[in-house]
Regions:
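Extended repeat-based interaction scaffolds and adjacent low-complexity, acidic/S/T/P-biased segments
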Residues: 63-65
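Alpha-helix boundary/capping residues
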Residues: 78-80, 191, 201
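Acidic/histidine-enriched, beta-strand-rich ligand/metal-binding domains
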Residues: 166-168, 197-203
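A common structural junction motif
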Residues: 80-89, 195-196
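Flexible helix-coil linker/hinge segments at domain or subdomain boundaries
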Residues: 205-207
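Helix-loop elements that line ligand-binding/catalytic pockets
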Residues: 175
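Short S/T/G/P-rich N-terminal loop/turn motif that feeds into the first structured element of a domain
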Residues: 1-60, 69-75, 88-172, 182-190, ...
């Protein structure tokens, strides 16, 4: 069964760029990591800055898809890349995820094993990844619409965390953590400020090379801005599970 992981590190400003370069220079070793199906280093952005996200030059992320859980464990237990990624960081976080559904598109050949995956229930916590390349002609339209979505997301108690990502120039990606699948669906497709943004985006492609996937959060460690949104989501899920007997 494939396993995904997201790794985030924040560095002191004087050493942030140097730390990112050290990781980037190890990309060949990273690509040859045993059991790694696909992976990439991302810049991150704060989506709370409007009208467009502001890149956070102190924080970087690595997203991976592993052939199985054993490959992920080996990576975490002593990979030179993860050691370089953590070196000098003032804050680190990672989450282990189970790919659940690829709803649209493909990212860097991400394996689509939907037929073998356990489907998510509406009350399960969920992590959602969106990805796409913003055509130059759609840049203003896209970021104006993004402002509408961000304002609503900030006020939604079901969203426990949201991070902007970019692995290449001109791409826009988000990774968000939700209390439940049902609440994530309501935000994306239900009535509200998001609906007028979603409908026209289907007829006028604001994003090219789109990718939209959901993940089941399995575990996490560390913090992002002093919090662990996946741990919060899992603790809520455990609290909602009735005790046997």
């Amino acid at each position: 069964m494939p396993v995904a992981s997201l790794h985030i590190a924040r560095y002191p400003l004087p050493t942030a760029l140097r730390s990112a370069v050290h990781v980037w220079l190890r990309r060949a070793d990273f690509e040859n990591t045993p059991g790694l199906a696909i992976g990439a280093l991302f810049n991150t952005a704060d989506f709370w800055t409007l009208p467009s996200p502001k890149f956070n030059l102190r924080r970087y992320a690595i997203l991976c898809c592993w052939e199985d859980e054993a490959a992920f464990d080996t990576f975490m237990d002593g990979s030179p890349l993860i050691e370089a990624f953590h070196r000098g960081a003032s804050e680190t976080w990672h989450a282990k995820l189970e790919p659940a559904t690829v709803l649209e598109g493909q990212w860097r050949g991400w394996p689509d094993e939907s037929a073998e995956l356990t489907p998510l229930e509406d009350d399960d916590p969920v992590c959602v990844m969106t990805y796409g390349r913003v055509p130059i002609r759609q840049t203003w339209t896209f970021w104006r619409a993004n402002g509408i979505v961000v304002r609503q997301a900030r006020e939604n108690p079901a969203m426990l965390g949201w991070l902007g990502l970019a692995d290449r120039m001109g791409t826009a990606s988000t990774f968000s953590v939700w209390r439940s699948v049902a609440e994530a669906k309501t935000f994306a497709y239900g009535p509200g400020d998001h609906a007028p943004v979603v409908r026209p985006s289907r007829t006028v492609p604001w994003l090219e090379n789109r990718f939209f996937a959901r993940f089941r959060p399995l575990s996490s460690a560390g913090t992002i801005d002093g919090r662990d949104p996946v741990a919060e989501a899992l603790s809520r899920d455990l609290a909602a599970t009735p005790s046997p007997g």
